[in-house]
Design a protein with these regions (language model features):
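Aromatic-rich, solvent-exposed beta-strand/loop patch
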Residues: 21-44, 72-87, 185-193, 362-368, ...
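Extracellular/periplasmic solute-recognition and catalytic clefts
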Residues: 26-27, 40-99, 124, 129-130, ...
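Surface-exposed, Gly/Pro/Thr- and Asp/Glu-enriched linker/hinge segments
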Residues: 24-35, 66-68, 72-77, 107, ...
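Extracytoplasmic/peripheral linker and loop segments enriched in polar/acidic and small residues
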Residues: 82, 114-115, 119, 127, ...
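Append "and occasionally in soluble cytosolic enzymes with long acidic Gly/Pro-rich linkers
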Residues: 109-222, 290-293, 318, 365-367, ...
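Local pocket/hinge segments that shape ligand/substrate recognition
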Residues: 27-31, 41, 64-173, 191-193, ...
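Periplasmic binding protein-like
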Residues: 51-53, 57-67, 74-79, 222-278, ...
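Long beta-strand-rich cores associated with HINT superfamily self-processing modules
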Residues: 275, 339-386, 393-397, 683-684, ...
Length: 822
């Protein structure tokens, strides 16, 4: 006989437990849906897809353009993918010279040879054959899916025609320049000082860039060079091309690849980053000698020294022309990439670079409707270079785990690239009348005002003076007064200092905002104990362009910033003292201090270039030989209750906070064995450099719910079809139709920003450009008048439509060919 009472008791208990689990299941956790994430290295996308099929991986975060694995994903119902548009490939040249330090001639130290190399390569061949059709030919640094490309499409297309594949023209230029440089052609091979000139090509071994390395070697061989291809992984190649001294001549060409860190609504920074010394601290960039006019225009675009969109277009167009002439790198393809995942996994994916380029991935990562558990992510590389927020790794592979560990004042919309408030409550933007700044109707957290002029208050802080150990004020530098084209007042949430904590338990304070500000200036001055020559390259420009900032309230924290620079989108006209004022990651003031002490002592350096010059270790807070050195300086800081820039920071950081901070860091290091202390939704449990693995865990004290950004489920990428007559008689009007949809449904007119078109005539020249007219949801028309068709040469023409929706930051293209008849 069974015990009825016991059975009922068990049943009731089971029901109660089920109710508890049901309630818990409906509760939204803080920070993340999952408990932990394991990131492992998997170099091969083919193997990664097999591991996804087997359930050994849940997401493969590295974007790929390989066609065979893509076909596998599309044919497996258990797998799915996200599409991205931000990956692109290039050929990076070693531009120093014309001779290396050992006297060898460097052909790519000759500007005209670099320029001619644009015509030496067939980008269509690379896109179709080497990338299997999952790429588009790329001629300049602008991503053709982003809005800036469409703004200058006429110039861009003309340059694409000028620098299209023309082997004979490239060969003629190279031959003339080599003769001019003193080289001789012996039995079909170039010699210098009696020795053959050998071109050393570093080719990435993990993907199609291996094939690109072989291809460029073949092309260079045809114009008379002996070539050697050295196949290396990214981690193996980086110390040579990026961190090594380019004057040593250990390489000539590198098959580079880049991933846009966001959906760029404004790529005005890109010329400064890729063609000048001002943005990148690595030795290769510090060796650049840009064309002076390009250098000047790059700075103008970076600081927005224009007043109209037409003036901006002229600067952009001229910069594109000069970029081809300078060509320290030439672009090959924009990749049509995918991020593979298991179908039951959901996670925010940025249209630029997928999962790894959005700050939202840790909060949105989830397996079905589950709460908790572990998700395993694969990455082509893991722990490539040291992590530090001043001058550490900028590899996408390192950014993936790093982005999970730090918080921000604003979030970049992964579909449009525009900003959304996170720790910021509101922003008041004031700009000078006439500037082309606009606000999205949905951005109720931003106000926009236009005024005749903006006067900077005399007590605003301008820049740091290391000799005075304080900020120079506007009144001191500009007693006659100072004006700025833009002012922004940033209001942080009232609960900022109550809810945000660092992973070691330290409450977030104003000191975490101020020390990075001081350090960023101080590193540029020779008299500073943390002086870095790479930072000095930008110092003069930074001082001249500084317009000041001022704290209006400490709690709640409110400050105003004046700027020479401004952005077309009102939402992007802000500063964020809370977030990442350095490029890569965030650290609390008390661990930044440890790096400073180690650099002052010559043991570690924040940047690779300074580490090379000091023969010191490149600082890494996450793992490696830096850690015991940092721990040693932590002991010093504890013993002395050390505070840098004491005369300035003492007003904001108390003795009690100093002692508490260092004690927390010590306890953290003793527990975790590293100093990577963030304030984001996940924390670094441990980095395993030998095993190539990173272990992240949910940060229990993170204040924000995991579903805060759940709206970013799927980007509404437009599907475009351009159609029209196949023939037109010159002098006759012709109409073209553009059908725009998403998943078969007509795209609403209110969500289409613009439809632009260009007409390429039979000679490949841009004949006309303009804008289509919206007729109905999902339907636009383009009309070429009889006068316009009369001017087209007889023969085949191509019309291209460029559709820019408002719901995503990427454009969609389609084209149609028609013949002009007499």
């Amino acid at each position: 006989m069974f015990n009825r009472r016991l059975t009922i008791s068990i049943l009731v208990t089971a029901i109660l437990l089920a109710m508890v689990f049901s309630v818990n299941a409906n509760q939204v956790p803080k920070a993340t849906w999952v408990d932990e994430v394991i990131i492992v290295e998997e170099p091969s996308v083919t193997t990664a897809v097999s591991r996804l099929q087997a359930g050994d991986l849940d997401v493969y975060a590295t974007t790929s353009s390989e066609p065979v694995p893509f076909a596998t994903i599309r044919n497996d119902p258990n797998l799915d993918y996200y599409q991205t548009f931000g990956s692109y490939s290039e050929l990076t040249f070693n531009p120093v010279g014309p001779e290396f330090t050992d006297g060898r001639l460097n052909p790519f130290g000759i500007r005209k040879i670099r320029e001619a190399s644009n015509m030496l390569i067939d980008r269509d061949y690379i896109a179709q054959e080497l990338y299997g059709g999952l790429a588009l030919p790329k001629y300049n640094m602008l991503n053709n899916a982003y809005v800036d490309y469409s703004r200058v499409v006429e110039t861009a297309r003309a340059l694409e025609v000028k620098y299209a594949y023309n082997f004979d023209a490239a060969k003629d230029v190279i031959h003339a320049e080599m003769i001019e440089a003193g080289a001789t052609l012996v039995n079909g091979k170039w010699h210098y000082a009696g020795k053959p000139i050998e071109i050393l090509i570093l080719a990435r071994s993990e993907d199609q860039r291996r094939l690109v390395g072989d291809y460029i070697a073949e092309q260079l061989d045809k114009v008379g060079f002996v070539t050697t291809v050295d196949y290396r992984s990214g981690a193996e190649a980086s110390p040579i091309w990026m961190m090594g001294d380019p004057w040593e001549g250990k390489w000539h060409v590198y098959t580079g690849g880049w991933g846009a860190g966001a959906v760029y609504r404004d790529q005005g920074h890109i010329f400064d980053q890729m063609y000048t010394r001002r943005t990148m601290s690595q030795p290769l960039w510090q060796a650049l000698e840009p064309i002076p006019e390009l250098d000047e225009i790059s700075e103008k675009l970076y600081y927005k020294r224009f007043t109209t969109m037409e003036e901006r277009k002229e600067l952009y167009s001229r910069a594109l022309e000069l970029a081809f002439e300078d060509s320290p790198r030439i672009y090959t393809v924009d990749q049509i990439s995918y991020v593979a995942r298991r179908a039951d996994i959901s996670v925010a994916s940025d249209l630029a670079q997928g999962v790894s380029s959005t700050a939202l991935w840790p909060s949105t990562l989830r397996r079905g409707d589950e709460i908790g558990g572990t998700v395993k992510i694969g990455s082509q590389q893991v722990l490539v270079e040291p992590w530090n927020p001043v001058g550490g790794s900028n590899w996408t592979f390192d950014q993936l785990p790093m982005r999970a560990t730090f918080d921000r004042g604003f979030i970049s919309n992964p579909f449009t690239g525009n900003y959304l408030p996170h720790r910021i409550a509101k922003v008041e933007v004031t700009v000078k009348e006439g500037l082309p700044v606009a606000k999205s109707p949905d951005s109720d957290w931003v106000t926009l005002e236009f005024v005749p002029e903006i006067e900077v208050p005399g007590d605003a802080w301008l820049y740091w003076d290391p000799s005075l150990q304080r900020f120079v004020t506007v009144a001191e530098k500009y007693p006659e007064g100072l004006k700025a084209p833009r002012k922004s007042v940033i209001h942080y949430r009232d609960d900022l200092f109550d809810t945000v904590t660092w992973h070691d338990g330290s409450p977030y304070t104003v000191g975490d905002m101020l020390l990075p500000q001081v350090l960023s200036w101080d590193r540029g001055f020779e008299e500073s104990p943390v002086y870095d020559p790479a930072e000095a390259a930008n110092l003069k420009s930074a001082i001249n362009n500084a317009r000041g900032w001022k704290i209006l309230s400490l709690d709640p924290f409110v400050y105003e910033v004046y700027s020479e620079s401004w952005y077309i989108d009102a939402e992007q006209n802000l500063g964020d003292l809370f977030a990442v004022y350095y490029n890569y990651g965030a650290q609390p003031w008390h661990t930044l201090v440890l790096g400073m002490l180690a650099e002052m002592n010559g043991e570690l350096a924040f940047t690779a270039s300074k580490a090379n010059s000091l023969d010191a270790e490149w600082l890494g807070y996450n793992t490696g030989p830096s850690l015991p050195i940092l721990d040693k300086h932590l002991d010093y800081a504890i013993a002395n209750n050390y505070l840098p820039y004491e005369s300035f920071l003492r007003e904001f950081i108390s003795e009690e906070e100093i002692a508490s901070r260092y004690a927390n860091a010590k306890a953290w290091y003793q527990d975790k064995g590293h100093f990577w202390i963030g304030n984001g939704p996940m924390y670094l449990e441990k980095a395993y450099p030998v095993e190539r693995m990173v272990h992240l865990k949910r940060y229990e004290n993170y204040s924000e719910p995991a579903d805060k950004w759940a709206m970013f489920d799927e980007p509404r990428i437009a599907e475009v079809e351009l159609s029209g007559p196949a023939r037109v008689n010159a002098g006759t009007e012709i109409k073209f139709q553009i059908d725009i949809a998403f998943k078969g449904e007509a795209y609403p007119l209110e969500h289409i920003q613009e439809v632009k078109y260009i007409v390429l005539d039979a000679n490949g020249n841009v004949a006309y450009s303009g804008y289509g007219t919206g007729v109905a949801d999902g339907y636009f028309e383009i009309v070429l008048t009889g006068e316009e068709t009369a001017q087209l040469p007889i023969g085949s023409n191509t019309i291209e439509a460029i559709v820019l929706p408002t719901l995503v930051g990427g454009a969609t293209f389609d084209s149609h060919t028609f013949v002009t008849l007499p």
